[in-house]
UniProtKB/Swiss-Prot annotation:
Protein origin, superkingdom: Eukaryota
Gene Ontology biological process terms, A to Z: early endosome to late endosome transport
Protein family membership: Belongs to the UPF0507 family.
Name the record gives this protein: UPF0507 protein EC1118_1M3_1541g
Ranges for domain VPS9: 289-436
GO cellular component: early endosome; late endosome; plasma membrane; transport vesicle; tubular endosome
Protein species of origin: Saccharomyces cerevisiae (strain Lalvin EC1118 / Prise de mousse)
GO terms, molecular function: guanyl-nucleotide exchange factor activity; SNARE binding
Length: 1090
């Protein structure tokens, strides 16, 4: 075995198994011998762990353990026949080299380490890679599968000591939990212990049950009777405090109080609601209360001091507080009620965190004092909008059923209860309907009347006397909509125009710019969402006429709670897009990571989709140039990894013209743009992208190992992408793709060059027919350099109805081999061009070919006598060609390994760079950490497309060269030496004959001797018997020489022809279709990265 030295791979485990320069001297030589002819899967932990961690038990670094057979055995999964079968209903079971059990859930990319592992782990498959075999000691497969897992498998590991210079290096464990609040936790433990003791001692439970019954008996049906409740609680406390069972509880009274409250709450609450029946606060008639009515002092500020965005912020806080107060109806204890009340007031006053959208807003309330009156006024609105039905009952409960009466009088809870009490009084004053209250009630009625007229159910689009509603035009509903917003959403455009023209002073441009709903929607966003384009155009006209460019940019790029600007809602509003397009921030992303351009591209239901897409792209391009930059395609990738190419329905040439464009980019599901087009049958996009030279047609989806052909369900789609496959094939003549199974019969789609009306034809052919065709061709060309026997055998194994990743890789490899094989056969004109028109054509050609072959005379009938000079000439010819082929084969072997390692080391470089960046960011020294940000790399020395194509062609050419070399080797080192051996024996026999019978001209034949013998048992002489025996031997030797010579002659003629074909194929394959294509593609692709 030759010793070779290839670069070391970054991952120590992968390097140890596949990249051993001297396997016979390696400590893993027994493992290599065991795996020599076997197929297996390697589980590879991340290089980060193997290089920077050590085993807790052995104290050895993990990269040293990678050269320990016992450690490695657990990472090698042996493959059996069942490894190919994939059923979605059950998982795939594998056995490791040391007998442990591993279960792989291919669908979820999860591995379970089970029987035999002392640590059972659930591992995540991070990536699946196909590693072309580049060593000489594994013969079981041409490609091996590596499953990269998220952590080591069969050991406990910790970071090495040198990582102490990094902070927070260790990853947070999956099951880690935040530290609990100790005080709350201890109280909960005491409560649990208290309840456990009660359940263990039924006598105590019986005593407490009697007290519960006494409350239900003594307390009137319409009176909650706080005194009775407190009395039975005190009675239970007096009876339990001296009991040794409860002496260790520090909060015994609170525990007893809470336990009684838990068991008697329904009784107390029913008595409360009965008690206040008919006297509760009815908030239904106050549903039209608005901020402008309750914060009159704020609205009466001078024009220079009033800012509408303060009101919009108040509306958002009101909304949050109202939603939270609704939870009060679900409470069943004093603690729950008090918690809801306090949190509601905190949300209202802005003292707690709000959602991310609101945190970005300026605190407009800093311009006003949040005094008690203001808070009460806002809380009135909260109560109205939360639609609380038992407000007095909740207040009474909070005031009377606390386990600590001082808590409701002092502190934040005392303030909250006082505020609630003031609100109840506020509503009681409203019910009296006197003074200012009567005026407020009148405004509510007037508001209701106006809103009815503005309702979308009202067909009238006019208000007869708008002036009568002047005092309520500042109304805002619970969604934060102003009167203008309500007009817009209900398409009351005449009223909208009247308000804007007649009451311009009440609605200045500054307020129009700040008018937003609670979800952040501006008037312009509302108009687009409502489809009210007329209102949108009015607003845009006002803005363009009255606002500066800075104000326009700020307004148009305001975002709602979904981080969407008005541009994100523009789907088919061409005129509006043109009017405001230059002010749009085209890089601004919404919460889903989608830019405005992405949203427009993704809006498929618009009637003028292509025109809208083209217009939006041109405007965005202009915007980029205006900001002194080029259009950046990467700015428009969403949170799921979808690019503009992924979502564009038609007209992709506008994107394909971009230079720095990765048209093979995968989203987070592993789908390329082409896969998406094929999946959704976007034929125009398929047609355009398959003409782009940058396309990698057979890009594989990592999680499923699907290619675009696996998503094609339509013949027209298969034909279109098959045409690109033909053009990318070795000689551009034929392409095999899309293996399908029908009742365990495998069929394949074949696209080939056609002489008919269309330049290409796609047909479905049974794989058994292809197998028969290969057998027929092999009979006609027994010395072909194409490894047809290998392909025939591989087709025989295609009997599985469903395939795992392992099977899919084999199928993909076979289809590539058949594509290359039939490209060569067509190139050398061994089969007719129109053979693949349909399956019947193939079967007919096979029958005709068989008939012609049977009619040819057999070479054995007229064996050719070969002279030594002729054998010498053949031997010299074959030896020269064998030396040339061997030299070329060695060069191909080196080239194949170099190409594989270029790809492997490029990946290693990228992984190492990512690891270095990751570690650099964790350096404790901030200056050192920041230095890592400036590291620039350029690991893409060659394009992925050009490397893959060249490697596939080199591997195929190497297979063909090995096949031809084996034929030459058989003739040169077996057949010809055998002829010379028999020739020597023949000469020796002749010499012996001449020496023994010098007077004989030539040896007698057996027939001649027998004819001269007389009838009856005449005894031949010893001399005659010897002469006859030598004559028979000479004849047999002569016959053998003729047969061997004839066989060598025929083989030489066919090999000479095959060598000629091989040289023609080699030159075209290596020079034109491989090296030149590699250089051309690589230069053109990499030029775009400069």
């Amino acid at each position: 075995m030759s010793v070779y030295h290839l670069p070391t791979l970054l991952n120590p485990l992968v390097n140890a198994i596949f990249n051993c320069p001297e396997p016979e001297r390696s400590p893993l030589k027994k493992l290599f011998a065991n795996l020599k002819t076997r197929r297996f899967i390697l589980l590879a932990p991340p290089s980060e762990y193997l290089l920077n961690y050590h085993d807790v038990k052995s104290k050895l670094p993990l990269h040293d353990l990678c050269y320990n057979a016992e450690f490695i055995n657990s990472y090698i999964l042996l493959m059996t026949e069942n490894s190919y079968i994939n059923t979605n209903s059950r998982d795939s079971h594998y056995e490791t080299l040391d007998g442990k059990t591993v279960v792989i859930q291919w669908k979820n990319n999860v591995i379970h380490a089970l029987n035999g592992f002392h640590i059972r782990r659930r591992l995540k498959i991070l990536e699946t890679k196909i590693l072309p075999n580049f060593n000489d000691y594994f013969e079981g497969a041409a490609d091996f599968i590596i499953l990269f897992i998220d952590q080591p498998l069969n050991c406990e590991f910790v970071p090495n000591d040198y990582l102490q210079c990094f902070h927070n290096y260790e990853k947070i464990p999956k099951n880690a939990h935040a530290m609990p609040n100790l005080s709350i936790d201890s109280f909960q433990q005491e409560r649990s212990s208290f309840e456990n003791i009660l359940h263990i001692h039924p006598a105590r439970l019986t005593q407490l049950g009697q007290l519960f019954s006494s409350y239900r008996t003594l307390a009137p049906g319409d009176d909650p009777s706080r005194s009775i409740f407190e009395s039975i609680v005190q009675q239970a406390f007096d009876g339990m405090k001296s009991d040794s069972l409860f002496k260790n509880f520090s909060n015994l009274y609170d525990l007893i109080h809470d336990y009684f409250e838990l068991n008697l709450y329904d009784d107390i609450w029913s008595r409360l609601t009965t008690h206040f029946k008919g006297h509760e606060v009815d908030t239904e008639k106050y549903k039209y209360f608005s901020v402008n009515q309750l914060l009159t002092d704020f609205y009466s500020k001078d024009y220079g001091e009033f800012e509408l965005h303060d009101i919009t912020l108040i509306e958002r806080r009101l909304h949050l507080a109202s939603k939270h107060l609704q939870k009060l109806a679900l409470t069943h204890s004093y603690a729950e009620k008090s918690k809801i009340l306090v949190e509601t007031l905190q949300k209202l006053s802005g003292t707690t965190e709000m959602d991310s959208h609101q945190l970005e807003l300026p605190d407009g309330l800093n311009n006003m004092t949040m005094d008690a009156d203001t808070l009460i006024s806002l809380f009135v609105l909260v109560v109205c909008r939360s639609e609380q039905k038992h407000l007095k009952s909740h207040l009474y409960y909070l005031q009377n059923f606390s386990n600590n009466s001082s808590s409701t009088k002092f502190g934040i809870l005392g303030y909250a209860v006082s505020t609630l009490e003031a609100v109840v009084c506020y509503f009681e004053d409203f019910n009296k309907n006197t003074g200012n209250v009567a005026k407020a009630n009148t405004l509510c009625e007037k508001t209701k009347n106006l809103l009815d007229k503005l309702s979308c159910e009202n067909p009238t689009n006019e208000v007869e006397d708008l002036a009568t509603y002047k005092d309520i035009l500042t109304y805002r509903n619970e969604q934060g909509q102003s009167i203008l917003s309500i007009c817009i959403t209900n398409h009351k455009n005449y009223i909208l125009l009247d308000i804007l023209s007649e009451y311009e002073t009440d609605f200045p441009v500054e307020d129009l710019l700040e008018d937003e709903t609670i979800d952040g929607s501006t008037l312009l966003i509302e108009s687009i969402k409502a489809g009210n384009l007329e209102a949108a155009k009015v607003l845009i006209k006002i803005m363009l006429f009255n606002c500066t460019e800075e104000e326009l940019v700020s307004y148009i790029n305001k975002t709602d709670k979904y981080a969407r600007t008005v541009a994100h809602y523009l789907t088919h509003e061409m005129d509006i897009l043109k009017s405001i397009g230059n002010y749009i921030d085209w890089k601004r992303k919404n919460s889903s990571g989608q830019t405005p351009l992405f949203s427009i591209f993704r809006s498929y239901d618009q009637p003028n989709y292509e025109e809208m897409v083209k217009t939006a792209f041109d405007i965005a391009n202009t915007w980029y140039r205006k900001h002194n930059s080029l259009f950046d395609y990467l700015d428009h990738t969403d949170n799921k990894g979808n690019s503009l190419l992924h979502v564009l329905k038609t007209n992709i040439p506008i994107l394909l013209q971009l230079t720095k464009l990765d048209i093979n980019e995968e989203n987070y599901k592993g789908l390329t743009p082409l896969m998406v087009y094929v999946k959704y049958k976007r034929l125009s996009n398929i047609d355009a992208i398959t003409k782009d030279r940058r396309l990698i047609l057979e890009k594989v989806q990592n999680s499923t190992f699907f290619t675009c052909f696996d998503y094609a369900k339509d013949h027209s789609v298969l034909s279109k992408i098959g045409e690109r496959g033909v053009k990318d094939s070795l000689f551009g003549l034929i392409y095999f793709h899309s293996l399908r199974y029908h009742n365990l019969n495998a069929t394949t789609n074949i696209t080939s060059v056609s002489n008919a009306e269309k330049p290409f034809a796609t047909t479905v052919i049974n794989m058994k027919t292809i197998q028969g065709l290969l057998r027929s061709i092999l009979k006609d060309n027994p010395f072909t350099f194409l490894p047809l026997n290998t392909y025939i055998d591989e087709i025989s194994h295609l009997n599985r109805s469903d395939l795992t990743i392992i099977g899919k890789t084999d199928v993909t490899s076979l289809l590539h081999e058949l594509t290359n094989c039939f490209n060569v056969l067509l190139f050398l004109k061994k089969i007719p061009e129109n053979l693949f028109t349909d399956e019947a054509s193939i079967l007919y050609w096979m029958r005709i070919n068989t008939s012609k072959r049977n009619q040819k005379p057999s070479g054995k009938e007229n064996p050719k006598t070969m002279e030594p000079e002729e054998i010498n000439m053949i031997q010299s010819f074959l030896r020269f060609n064998f030396d040339e082929i061997s030299s070329f084969k060695a060069s191909l072997n080196i080239l194949r390994k170099v190409l594989i390692f270029i790809n492997l080391k490029s990946d290693d470089f990228e992984d190492a760079y990512k690891g270095l960046n990751e570690m650099g960011r964790k350096l404790i020294n901030s200056e050192a950490s920041s230095a890592f940000k400036g590291i620039i790399t350029n690991h893409n020395m060659f394009s992925e497309l050009s490397l893959a194509e060249l490697l596939e062609n080199v591997r195929f050419l190497e297979q063909c060269t090995i096949q031809l070399s084996s034929f030459v080797q058989i003739i040169l080192f077996e057949k010809i030496p055998n002829w010379w051996k028999h020739y020597g024996e023949f000469l020796a026999l002749h010499k012996s004959y001449r020496k023994a019978f010098p007077n004989m001209v030539k040896p007698k034949s057996a027939s001649d001797t027998s004819s001269r013998a007389p009838l009856g048992g005449f005894i031949e002489t010893k001399r005659e018997q010897s002469e006859q025996r030598l004559a028979v031997q000479i004849k047999a030797s002569s016959k053998m020489l003729k047969e061997l010579g004839s066989e060598i002659f025929v083989a030489h003629e066919r090999l000479a022809e095959e060598l000629s074909n091989y040289m023609e194929f080699r030159k075209a394959c290596l020079d034109q279709r491989s090296l030149v294509a590699f250089a051309t593609t690589n230069i053109s692709v990499l030029q775009e990265c400069v």
